[in-house]
Each structure stands twice: as C-alpha cells, then as structure tokens.
Regions:
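Class I S-adenosyl-L-methionine
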Residues: 1-134
Length: 134
C-alpha cells in the first residue's frame, strides 16, 4: 500500500499502521523507504498481540532485534510477552528447517538463529529497563 503512495514519505503526513502479520517486513520497508517510527505500542486483541506504529517521514536505523521485536517498545508492558512469542515462532521454524536436506534451508536456519539471539538480547534490555515480571 505504501509503495503505491510515495507522497506519504514527503513529510506532511502522520501514518498510523497496525500490521496483522510480518511486522518485521513492514519495519524494514519503512526503514528502507524514508519513514521513521515515532512511536510504537502493543495492543492485545483476542489473545493476539499486534504492534501499532505512528510513522512519519524521516530516516531511522533499526537493529535486527528492533526489526523483529519492535522499534520503540522498551517501556511497553506487553513487550516481554511479544518478544517471547516471536522467539517461540522462530524456534519452531528453525526446528522445521533442521529436518530439511536443502542447503538453502541450513543458511535460513542460521539466519533465524541470529535473529533469536538478537531478540534474547533485546528481551534482556527490556527486562533491565522494566524490572523482572512476576
């Protein structure tokens, strides 16, 4: 949708985005196409956590952990749960790829392991900023 509306990156608009899936792909697109996430919050709806993003024109650089676990969620009360859910999904994907005999899948599994490591680091930062959960 944003690809078809490049004028939204010209600095005159604030966008409110709530990706239902693949939020990491949206964050990467935003970073690569002249958008910046000003604020990000998590919303729990029927047992599923969704990120909501306030996006403006601008430049931003996101780490691997931020691409997958959220750009501006350090103080969000759902942040820890959101990161854990991402880690579990990625670990399931890694387990599935482990049974593959295709060389490309080994590389994909290695990349997913790097993402899990980045998310674990991000989770520790979140816990340090917010204190351990009970």
């Amino acid at each position: 949708i944003l690809s078809a509306a490049p004028w939204t990156a010209m600095g005159h608009h604030t966008l409110l985005l709530q990706p239902m899936t693949r939020s990491e792909a949206l964050r990467l697109f935003l970073m690569d196409h002249g958008y910046a996430i000003k604020r990000e919050a998590l919303v729990l709806d029927r047992g599923t956590i969704y990120p909501c993003m306030e996006v403006i024109a601008g430049q931003m650089r996101l780490s691997t952990g931020q691409l997958w676990g959220g750009a501006r969620l350090r103080q969000d009360p759902l942040g820890d749960t959101y990161i854990i859910q991402k880690i579990i999904r990625l670990q399931r994907a890694i387990a599935g790829l482990r049974h593959s005999e295709r060389p490309d899948d080994y590389e994909k599994a290695d990349r997913l392991r790097e993402i899990v490591t980045a998310l674990l680091s991000m989770r520790e930062e979140w816990r340090h900023a917010n204190g351990p959960r009970n």
